[in-house]
Amino acid sequence: MTMHNSVEFQDAFDVIVVGAGHSGCEAALATARLGCRTLLLTLNLDKIAWQPCNPAVGGPAKSQLTHEVDALGGEIGKMADRTYLQKRILNSSRGPAVWALRAQTDKREYAAIMKNIVENQENLSIRESMVTDLVLGANDEVIGVETYFGVAFQCKAVILTTGTFLGGKIWVGNKSMPAGRAGEFAAEGLTETLNRLGFETGRLKTGTPARVDKRSVDYSKMQLQPGDEEVRWFSFDPDVWVEREQLPCHMTRTTPETHRLIRENLHLSPVYGGWVEAKGPRYCPSIEDKIVRFVDKESHQIFIEPEGRDIPELYIQGFSTGLPENLQLQMLRSLPGLENCVMLRPAYAVEYDYLPATQCYPTLMTKKVAGLFCAGQVNGTTGYEEAAAQGIVAGINAARFVRDQEMIVFPREQSYLGTLVDDLCTKDLREPYRMLTSRSEYRLLLRSDNSDQRLTPLGREIGLIDDRRWQLFTRKQEQITGEKERLYATRVKENDEVGKAIASNTQQAIKGSITLADLLRRPGFHYVDLDRYGLGNPELTPAEREGAEIDIKYSGYLARQQSQIEQIARQAQRQLPRDLDYTTVETLSKEAREKLNKVKPMTIGQAARIGGVNPADINALLIYLELRQTKHQTGLAALP
């Protein structure tokens, strides 16, 4: 770290964002759009918002994050809607709480459009540079950054979004080189600066599969995976929707020969060979991990996905590996359809430094250094969507910090985004964190379709939702409310022709009469069925019809979950004293005292979600707080 009195600044900004990946772009755009003079520093101006692994956005829980970022005024959803190659709804046979939109994207088009957006954003400057040091003020607050070549920039807040570049090292077999990703050098010096400031850092690992030439594969031996006929959208803004021809993906499977090659050469893998000890992502394992962990499984699905419309590269999803390059081609050619494939880029593993996010407040500002924020993979997450969500949170709060406004904590019962940040800041995570629907106890309320209803009013209040978007939002909500009123008020009689037809076709009798809302509550009956009987409203958009149907069909479950939230919230939002020394609370278990003192939760709800803190500890803590408050009030009463 460098102290302010020894630095000459070249320029001054309100906010500096370090790293221009998916987190950095959201953070920089948010601060700039909120009126802060922002500098976005990146190692390579040609790799802004690059998708170094799977060029895709969405999937289970990740699509909810993408919708939520858009609802707040962010960019990732718009980008996916502009650049998709294929779109599919996953889990469509299940309830709306777990529906997941996934888009395969054109990675070069995605990066080019995002680069154009950040280059033309008012209040935002971009520059190629490697940040190696932080400049601190007299009170150990951040006041600037210094680059590898000795240039310093002044600022009031810094957002670190360094991805896999901090101390990055890529591995192919037992060969390694310093790099944040293939062909790009690692960031040096910043980890050492953070360690000197007292931050704990650790190492994590991830990987990416080989890329093959699409002209060298035989699709006839694979299973076709087409996109959905009805295209859905991540963004709530129709102006960014682009109707385009979809490209197919394909599926193949591993064979006994694939498994033999991997098992016989496990000792050549960087992890199984003992050269890399960093923990990899549990929910996106390498192919060698799959073979070891699922010994009884005879075959694994492998998806063959295009990386762009105008390039020959195919992404081999589910086949990431750190095995030697000369072995990788044999493995690829053991897959049906890839017997004669040409490998364009080898697979590799990458290990990198991260900061356990328990060192951050839920605002994503660090606890040790005022004005320093962290977002994305540096916080121990994996995935573009998780990174983008943290980026917009850090950007919003950095802008508010600069303006001396109260920073925003997103409660976990309000959004997946809030669940993500809350988990990161309260749980001692030692492996890359991926968002899952199962991580949210409120997932029935936190659906993709109502992300705007939950977050757009907040985005408007913050200043990221303009008048046009606000009008779109309010009209949609008015239409849904009006349609629900109509559905509750309109009745179908059993003796009407339409009533007889419905009873006959559904094999369910109508006794006297029934409201359209009660029809929608019936299993297997949907709004499209109302249309079939001339009972729908043709003036509504698909999103408005779906919103009304879901609210009515699941109203009982929604009300029950809302009641649970309110009950928990009565105690969960209770503030914990900042100066509370948990080691002195003898009624807490030893582990709870240690964990609580390390994390320093802001509320009872956060304390309850810390690993190692059980319900008995929470009860003991509540009793302690009551006794402390009583003692304080007694002391005040005794004063003359």
UniProtKB/Swiss-Prot annotation:
Gene Ontology MF term list: flavin adenine dinucleotide binding
Primary location: cytoplasm
Keyword NAD: yes
Subcellular location: Cytoplasm
SUPFAM superfamilies membership: FAD/NAD(P)-binding domain
Pfam families according to UniProt: GIDA (PF01134), GIDA_C_1st (PF21680), SAM_GIDA_C (PF13932)
Alphabetized InterPro entries for the sequence: FAD/NAD-bd_sf, GIDA_C_N, MnmG, MnmG-rel, MnmG-rel_CS, MnmG_C, MnmG_C_subdom, MnmG_C_subdom_sf
Gene3D superfamilies: FAD/NAD(P)-binding domain, GidA associated domain, C-terminal subdomain, tRNA uridine 5-carboxymethylaminomethyl modification enzyme MnmG/GidA
Keywords noted in UniProt: Cytoplasm, FAD, Flavoprotein, NAD, tRNA processing
Residue numbers binding NAD(+): 280-294
Binding positions (FAD): G19, A20, G21, H22, S23, G24
GO biological process, one term: tRNA methylation
Stretches assigned to coiled coil: none
Cofactor(s) named in the record: FAD
Gene Ontology CC entries for this record: cytoplasm
PANTHER family: GLUCOSE INHIBITED DIVISION PROTEIN A (PTHR11806), PROTEIN MTO1 HOMOLOG, MITOCHONDRIAL (PTHR11806:SF0)
HAMAP family assigned to the protein according to its UniProt record, in alphabetical order: MnmG_GidA
Record text on subunit structure and interactions: Homodimer. Heterotetramer of two MnmE and two MnmG subunits.
UniProt record similarity statement: Belongs to the MnmG family.
Function in brief: NAD-binding protein involved in the addition of a carboxymethylaminomethyl (cmnm) group at the wobble position (U34) of certain tRNAs, forming tRNA-cmnm(5)s(2)U34.
Name used for this protein in its record: tRNA uridine 5-carboxymethylaminomethyl modification enzyme MnmG
UniProt organism field: Trichormus variabilis (strain ATCC 29413 / PCC 7937) (Anabaena variabilis)
Taxonomic lineage: Bacteria, Bacillati, Cyanobacteriota, Cyanophyceae, Nostocales
